[in-house]
Amino acid sequence: MIQRRKLLLLPLLTAVVAAGWLTNLSSAHASSTGNVIYHGGPVMAGNMKAYVIFWEPNGSFVSPKFNSLIKRYFRDIGDSGLYANNQQYTQTDSRAPIHAKLAGTFVDASPYPSVPFLQDADIQHEIMHAMSVQGWKPGINHAFFVYTALNEFICAPSLFGGFCSAPNSHLCAYHFGFGTPDGVVLYGAMPYAGNSLTGCFRGSSVSSPNHDIDADAEINLTSHEQMELATDPEGTGWFDTTGFFNGEIGDKCAGVFGPLDATGADVYFNGHPYIVQEEWDNAVSGCVISGP
């Protein structure tokens, strides 16, 4: 077997505060601290509904196929072997994440409230705006992904140091949540990966299986956050003994890819090529691209 390629990033940060939980997608190497452990909270049992928000003000830039490839990923991932890996991570009633689907998309061309740095509160407000416009509802099985454009950066909450996304720091993406009277809102904050391909992917010279390296890099970040939202949506699900700072199933395999084919893909979902990191599999105590 070809040796796995590794992405060199700094350690992932997860923390629980008030009604929220934060995960930074950054890890220098795959963790080797043993299997993940259940901590008594919910998972996204059954079907995850993914809602995608492209926040792209007039005049901003994303790569030509960025939106379409991200939407394709969400249509492809739900029946994949990678998502099936989540089925071993059950909650108290023995139910597990089974499937995921793209439930809705929204493109918002309204200006950012601040340039070039958005705060986490801005991301939360954007989600609430999209929910209001689209009629979307919160819930434990609903995941909202907010994507921003080139040269706009997202800053984590001040309680976590207020660090802003790469190349300003080693933050690449995170998942978080907040409560509303209608239920919990769970989301991934997804800065534009093209802002720092070296810090948040494999560099700019790697082969791009979809001929759009910004989109391929963003999909890799998306996959990491989606699998962690499925198995540890509230910071009380599945993570290892190091804690949820760097012990969720994506963290333990951050930067670990399968062998790449001639196109630069390490996996195919629904016949489409992708380059995404592996995820932790308790059944083999290691990283896999397809579950048990």
Question: Model-found features: residue ranges?
Answer:
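N-terminal carbohydrate-binding/catalytic regions of secreted carbohydrate-active enzymes
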Residues: 29-128
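Solvent-exposed loop/turn segments at secondary-structure junctions
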Residues: 56-61, 150-155, 192-197, 225-228, ...
